[in-house]
């Protein structure tokens, strides 16, 4: 007879397959369209099997966020100065989250639970290398998160997507160049 733990698992079901299916659903339907029931149906398993791996939707979204965060790569000298490097990382974050409707807003609404020290460092390290204090760099990251979440919440009218994307990029640039200018006048 198998031990109870062995009976609890559906063959082939693991956290990564659950996260992958959740990402597919979010890409199609947004965060609001994701449910544990739909996820279980998509995976072809009983609802209880999914819950044995992931206890609730919020934990699932934390795992999804971690998967998305892992896609962000650090900038290097080929991306320009330190402010350009921070911008490069922020634009990656934006683009990754944009493919999954509702994730940026969910993350912004739950910042303490969804904060990523790794992502924060990808932006703050270049800013601190440029001479900003840790507090200033942290404030800039928070401002960029708010800008990103706000941009993701707005339903851009058809035909204005490129203009909205350009405005977002310009906003990131304005925030970072403003910080650069301020740091040079101390």
Q: Where are the language model's segments positioned?
A:
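Residues in the recognition helix of alpha-helical DNA-binding motifs
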Residues: 53-54, 140
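C-terminal peripheral helix-coil segments that are non-catalytic and often amphipathic
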Residues: 1-5, 160-186
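Hydrophobic alpha-helical connector segments
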Residues: 73-109, 115, 134, 141-144
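Hydrophobic alpha-helical bundle segments that form small-molecule/ligand-binding pockets
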Residues: 119-161, 179-183
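Short, basic, alpha-helical segments at the C-terminal edge of helix-turn-helix-like DNA-binding modules
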Residues: 66-71
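Key DNA-contact positions within bacterial/archaeal DNA-binding proteins
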Residues: 37, 46-49
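Basic, helix-initiating cap at the start of DNA-binding domains
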Residues: 1-42, 54-62
């Amino acid at each position: 007879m198998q031990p109870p733990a062995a009976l609890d698992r559906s063959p082939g079901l693991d956290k990564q397959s659950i996260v992958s299916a959740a990402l597919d659903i979010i890409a199609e339907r947004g965060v609001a369209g994701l449910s544990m029931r739909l996820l279980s149906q998509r995976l072809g398993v009983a609802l209880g099997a999914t819950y044995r791996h992931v206890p609730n939707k919020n934990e699932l979204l934390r795992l999804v966020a971690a998967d998305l965060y892992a896609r962000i790569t650090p900038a290097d000298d080929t991306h320009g100065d330190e402010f350009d490097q921070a911008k490069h990382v922020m634009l990656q974050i934006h683009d990754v989250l944009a493919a999954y409707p509702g994730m940026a807003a969910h993350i912004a609404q739950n910042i303490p639970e969804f904060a990523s020290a790794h992502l924060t460092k990808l932006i703050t390290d270049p800013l601190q290398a440029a001479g900003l204090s840790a507090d200033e760099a942290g404030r800039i990251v928070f401002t960029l998160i708010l800008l990103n979440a706000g941009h993701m919440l707005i339903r851009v009218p058809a035909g204005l997507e490129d203009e909205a994307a350009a405005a977002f990029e310009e906003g990131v640039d304005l925030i970072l160049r403003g910080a650069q200018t301020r740091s040079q006048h101390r």
